[in-house]
Amino acid sequence: MSEWIYGFFMAWGMFLAIPCPKKIWSESARRRMLACLPLVGLIAGGVWALCAWLGGFLPRPIGALLCAAAPWLVTGFMHLDGFMDVCDAVMSRRDMETRQRILKDSHCGAFAVICMVLLALGQWSVFLSAEGIALWPLALVPVASRACAALAVLTLRPMTTSQYSAMERGGAPVVFAALVLAAACITAALVWGSFAPVAAAAVYALAAWYGVKQLGGMSGDVSGFALTLAELGGAAALVLWR
């Protein structure tokens, strides 16, 4: 049980910009840290849903901007870094070795900037179109996206340069993440009649498959790429599927 508690606070400290009440680290709890990602997602989702509610009291363009930026601000833009890195690498259309080298390059290329602009415009446009829609299901979209992230990192073949390449696959953390994903999807459907978490999971799966195919394995950057697109997909499904 202590490793699960360690894993939760480790995930909070690493993947949220909100100050963690207890800063701890245990190397043996790294797999539990990944399994606790969806619990951290519940915190991020709560902030996102609250911002969506507050945005209803603001002029629509400003409210849409708040909703679009909230999931990025609450994580300190961590997953956007992976999104931009993967876009740079994949859109270079070079051989596998070069794409992997570009992925690890700390410089920001033109492809990353262009994709980031398109992502921001897409997310802002989705929320600008959300007039008269209850956005509370947003609370569970980050839960679903992070449960998928945990499943992907703990089960898919890792990239040789990934920090998770030596980590043991499978086990209780995978079962826990799968159960949380199912709970998020079922809860959203029963409580709000929304399939936003399902849409987020589907987009994550497609994006992760594409990233792994293009870059030769799973990594934190590929997960961030898929997670970012998954949250856009979940929000779009919530707003556009009326």
Residue ranges and their predicted role:
Residues 1-25:
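Membrane-proximal soluble regions of multi-pass membrane proteins
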Residues 7-13, 27-52, 56, 166-170:
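N-terminal beta-alpha supersecondary unit
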Residues 19-25, 74, 78, 97-98, ...:
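C-terminal ends of transmembrane helices
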Residues 30-48, 89-133, 137-138, 175-188, ...:
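Multi-pass membrane catalytic core of lipid/isoprenoid biosynthesis enzymes
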Residues 35-87, 137-140, 194-213:
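Membrane-embedded alpha-helical segments that form the functional core of polytopic membrane enzymes
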Residues 70-108, 211-230:
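Acidic (Asp/Glu-rich) catalytic motifs at the cytosolic membrane interface
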Residues 92, 147-181, 215-218:
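Solvent-exposed interhelical
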Residues 175-192, 198-208:
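Hydrophobic core of alpha-helical transmembrane segments in multi-pass integral membrane proteins
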